[in-house]
């Protein structure tokens, strides 16, 4: 009977959580009414002043609304001015017949959208010979005018068209079949197979750059990692329904911003061990055990995952039940205290952040651990609260690792934000046809997301790369590639994204 009751309670909990996820707010922010449980400010909350406070004078004033912000956002755009004025024969005063003079102007701004346009650029290279040598029947030297090498020999692809298709798919999540339709409206008959070939060939140019970015990434001592699923239809030895994986590796708050994606057919921990071979330092991860195979690193856990489990346990409670005194709310409050401290330390130095954490965060962790150990024996292991408690206890060494260095972060949200563009794109184009296509997509995403992290315009940067990479004598020359990296000071200003 007790077992049936426990199962019923579990199913009811799962139902309430599923209902909340489907119809409720998706935010994990704590409701203001839940903040009454204050763990470490009890003395301040309960204290009463010994003496009467001096009266305070309330000063009220009206803030002037700042002006010019809308116009300032347009400063980076070209301006076309259309002037409306009276002709000379119209500048006559209706009262006295005198000549009217210009007194002032009235101005309004409008944004005009210019749809995508296409044109043919015909490259004509002239060949020269010497007339005198021709007349005197001497060996005639032939001189050919220099011409840039094409980005895709034998095709209609240009640096701009290849960059445009990549940006549409990997930044704006437009599948190739939709781009095929868009080009048709421009009067261009370009099949999605042709567009796919452009992407594959472009990824070949970008691959040495991504390899160079990986070399820089492995030199850092703090990294973040995450993984998500990807369906590849023609994976050798696997059915079309089987999930493959896209792994993410990126730098932290220090060092150059680098975001790399790596396609692998499985979720085996050997993949991050291989990719991160040679890396020594701290690795921010979630609770997946596969990262334990990475040697020579200190794993740093994610408090956002731990907090989310207590948040789900709280949301799954019956609607009429008071939540402020529940164990789920207490566990969530511990997590909120830690995040509140981190918000205060957002702009301080790593040394100061480490000192404050040891002074304020460490006591919270010690109290939380004692609370978890006490609650574990009181809670059903399979309940959402039991799972939240078990997760925190099982991950405790990783969850407390952020105390070791002030540069470390409380959560792994940095990697989750970086993997989100791929997840959004996946909802639109759903799958990759082949492993080769999946690897090409990982390469392109790596360049684009790193460029965005560096404040670059993805289209302009890709266009610049496809103009420069074919001209390199050695496309794998480290020094030449370093000048093309997203954080390089050698990049032209045209690659920069306009500041909003």
Over which residues does each language-model region extend?
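Catalytic center-proximal scaffold of phosphoryl-transfer enzymes
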Residues: 69, 90-91, 101, 125-500
């Amino acid at each position: 009977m007790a077992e049936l009751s426990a199962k019923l309670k579990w199913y009811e909990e799962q139902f309430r959580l599923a209902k909340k996820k489907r119809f409720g707010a998706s935010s994990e922010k704590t409701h203001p009414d839940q903040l009454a449980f204050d763990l470490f400010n009890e003395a301040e909350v309960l204290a009463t002043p010994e003496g009467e406070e001096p009266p305070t004078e309330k000063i009220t004033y009206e803030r002037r609304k700042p002006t010019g912000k809308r116009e300032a956002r347009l400063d980076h755009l070209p301006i076309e001015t259309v002037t409306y004025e009276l002709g000379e024969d119209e500048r006559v005063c209706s009262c006295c017949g005198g000549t009217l003079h210009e007194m002032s102007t009235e101005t309004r701004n409008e944004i005009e959208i210019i749809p995508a346009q296409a044109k043919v650029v015909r490259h004509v290279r002239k060949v020269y010979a010497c007339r005198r040598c021709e007349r005197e029947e001497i060996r005639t030297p032939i001189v050919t005018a220099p011409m840039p090498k094409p980005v895709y020999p034998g095709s209609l692809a240009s640096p701009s068209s290849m960059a445009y298709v990549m940006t549409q798919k990997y930044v704006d999540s437009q599948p190739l079949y939709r781009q095929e339709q868009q080009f048709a409206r421009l009067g261009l008959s370009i099949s999605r197979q042709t567009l796919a070939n452009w992407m594959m060939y472009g990824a070949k140019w970008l691959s040495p750059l991504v390899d160079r970015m990986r070399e820089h990434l492995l030199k850092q001592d703090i990294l973040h990692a995450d993984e998500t699923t990807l369906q590849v239809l023609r994976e050798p030895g696997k059915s079309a329904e089987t999930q493959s994986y896209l792994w993410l590796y990126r730098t932290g708050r220090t060092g150059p911003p680098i975001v790399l994606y790596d396609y692998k057919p499985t979720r085996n921990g050997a993949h991050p061990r291989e990719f991160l071979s040679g890396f020594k330092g701290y690795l921010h991860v979630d609770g997946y055990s596969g990262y334990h195979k990475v040697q020579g690193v200190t794993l740093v856990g994610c408090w956002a995952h731990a907090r989310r489990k207590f948040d789900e346990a709280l949301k799954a409670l019956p609607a009429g039940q008071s939540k402020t005194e529940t164990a789920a709310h207490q566990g969530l409050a511990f997590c909120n205290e830690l995040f509140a401290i981190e918000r205060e330390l957002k702009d301080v130095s790593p040394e100061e952040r480490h000192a404050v954490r040891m002074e304020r965060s460490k006591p919270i962790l010690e109290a939380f651990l004692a609370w978890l150990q006490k609650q574990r024996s009181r809670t059903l292991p399979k309940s959402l609260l039991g799972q939240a408690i078990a997760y925190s206890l099982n991950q405790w060494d990783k969850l407390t690792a952020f105390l070791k260095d002030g540069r470390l972060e409380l959560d792994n949200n940095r990697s989750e934000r970086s993997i989100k563009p791929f997840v959004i794109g996946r909802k639109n184009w759903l799958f990759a046809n082949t492993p080769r296509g999946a690897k090409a997509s990982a390469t392109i995403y790596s360049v684009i997301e790193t460029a965005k992290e560096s404040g670059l315009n993805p289209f302009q940067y890709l266009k610049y790369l496809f103009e420069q990479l074919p001209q390199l004598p050695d496309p794998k020359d480290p020094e030449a590639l370093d000048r093309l990296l997203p954080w390089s000071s050698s990049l032209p200003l045209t690659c920069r994204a306009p500041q909003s």
